[in-house]
């Protein structure tokens, strides 16, 4: 029988795995910082620096950036902040994975716990959960045409969705913020928080338009000795673009959650 074949390529899910790790480290307070009286607030982010696919396992390397706001006995400041980088490197066993596979890693911060050993040293314990999603390339051959007089062929057009591009990119925003007239000048920034709201993305020709709002909170030491701790808030509109050569007007976009 005479027929034509065509190769079809795709990406298929292969395996999933979750792993929980604990980062435990004692950290000294820098000489330039006042003594720690009490921890007030903590937070952190995970920076994944490397992922390596191996036979039956995956290596992940990165750091947890810890930030803390604490109270002091210093009457001129009362509040101070500190930051530490806590490195980690882990191997997770996943049966059947190969160096040619692809991995997507997500994380959740389950717990951040601090213990004050003394006024110059704190113990930091972080509990993280990593989710690994393994995919592999698929290549299959399918019959698209049969050249035979005695063979009947039924054809049907089917709409399919094709993955054009799957990548990460960074939208860089730069704004100059002016303090309200009733606020003291900034001597030292202690704590910042940035929250995004109503974030939306729209496909354009070879670009992605991003719109929304950015709420900024800053806690700082002012130059006014009578009111040393000050804060300020801003709401900034977001309207920027990311270059994406693969995108066209009929492309469907999915933002990560």
Which residues are covered by each model-predicted region?
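Alpha-helical, hydrophobic structural elements that either
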Residues: 1-33, 144-183
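Short, solvent-exposed beta-strand/turn "edge" segments of beta-rich domains on protein surfaces
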Residues: 14-17, 35-40, 50-61, 116-121, ...
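Extended beta-sheet lipid-handling architectures
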Residues: 22, 43-48, 61-63, 85-87, ...
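Short amphipathic beta-strand and strand-loop transition segments with alternating hydrophobic
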Residues: 41-53, 104-117, 191-203, 253
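Surface-exposed interaction/gating patches
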Residues: 47-49, 160-222
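Extended intrinsically disordered, low-complexity coil regions enriched in Ser, Thr, Gly, Ala
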Residues: 58-100, 137-154, 208-211, 215-249
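Hydrophobic, ordered structural segments
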Residues: 104-149
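Conserved small/polar residues in nucleotide/adenosyl-binding loops
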Residues: 251-257
């Amino acid at each position: 029988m005479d027929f034509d074949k065509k190769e079809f390529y795709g990406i298929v899910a292969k395996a999933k795995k979750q792993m929980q790790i604990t980062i435990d480290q004692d950290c000294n307070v820098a000489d330039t910082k006042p003594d720690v009286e009490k921890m007030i607030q903590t937070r952190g982010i995970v920076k994944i620096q490397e992922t390596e696919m191996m036979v039956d396992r995956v290596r992940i390397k990165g750091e947890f950036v810890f930030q803390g706001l604490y109270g002091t006995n210093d009457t001129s400041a009362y509040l101070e902040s500190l930051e530490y980088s806590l490195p980690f490197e882990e191997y997770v066993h996943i049966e059947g994975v190969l160096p040619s596979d692809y991995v997507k890693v997500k994380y959740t911060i389950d717990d951040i716990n601090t213990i004050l050993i003394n006024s110059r040293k704190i113990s930091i314990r972080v509990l993280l959960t990593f989710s690994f999603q393994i995919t592999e390339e698929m290549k299959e051959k399918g019959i698209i045409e049969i050249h035979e007089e005695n063979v009947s062929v039924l054809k049907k057009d089917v709409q399919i969705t094709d993955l054009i591009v799957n990548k990460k990119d960074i939208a860089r925003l730069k704004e100059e913020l002016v303090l309200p007239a009733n606020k003291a000048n900034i001597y030292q920034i202690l704590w910042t928080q940035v929250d995004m709201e109503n974030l939306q993305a729209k496909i354009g020709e070879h670009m992605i338009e991003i719109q929304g709002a950015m709420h900024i909170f800053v806690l700082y030491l002012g130059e006014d000795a009578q009111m040393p701790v000050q804060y300020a808030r801003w709401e900034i509109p977001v309207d920027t673009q990311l270059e994406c050569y693969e995108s066209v007007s009929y492309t469907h976009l999915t933002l990560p959650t």
